[in-house]
Amino acid sequence: TALRALHPGDIAVIGNATGCMQVSSLMYPDAAYEDSYIHNAFENAGATISGVETAYKALRKKGKIGEEYKFITFGGDGGTYDIGFQSLSGALERGHDFVYVCYDNGAYMNTGIQRSSATPMYADTTTTPVGTESDGKPQVRKDLAAVLAAHNIAYVGQTTFVGNMKDL
């Protein structure tokens, strides 16, 4: 069986940080999303979705929202592994109820192929030093799954996904 973040009939709020995923999933006239959609900056996908989820809980508790919503957000590897990690870590540590998907292509591809901590060791990017002494990025790739699992959350998974974004 397939694990799905959303099922037919679910009502969702979807967040998406600026990056390759945001650009590739909102091509006119076919957007991948039919639910409420929030576009946010590279670094604040975790903060945005945790804030929306908190507001939802407060409004539901007051009886102003009757429907049950699910929350899912997307971030690129740069915005997840690096510049947005603190907001994601905080949201996980506080126990917010959401699904986070990292669209990882191994570098800041949307802004010119700069290295991120998701870039594999020895990979060349536009920020790799040049010359015969350079063997590419000298650091190992961050083990994000292990770092996220250390937050004692219910589930961490990794996959290679090459299908239709609407199938996610």
Task: Mark where each language-model region is.
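Thiamine diphosphate
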Residues: 1-69
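Short hydrophobic segments within beta-strands
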Residues: 15-17, 74, 101
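Active-site metal-binding loops of divalent metal-dependent hydrolases
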Residues: 19, 76-79
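A near-ubiquitous, low-amplitude feature marking generic local secondary-structure context
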Residues: 25, 31-35, 74, 131, ...
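Secretory-pathway/luminal and periplasmic proteins that interact with or process carbohydrate-rich
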Residues: 26, 80-83
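A general structural-boundary detector
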Residues: 35-38, 78, 135
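Short glycine-rich loop/turn motifs that provide flexible caps or phosphate-binding loops at active sites
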Residues: 50, 75, 83
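Glycine-rich ThDP/TPP pyrophosphate-binding loop and its adjacent helix/strand module
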Residues: 62-71, 82-98, 103-168
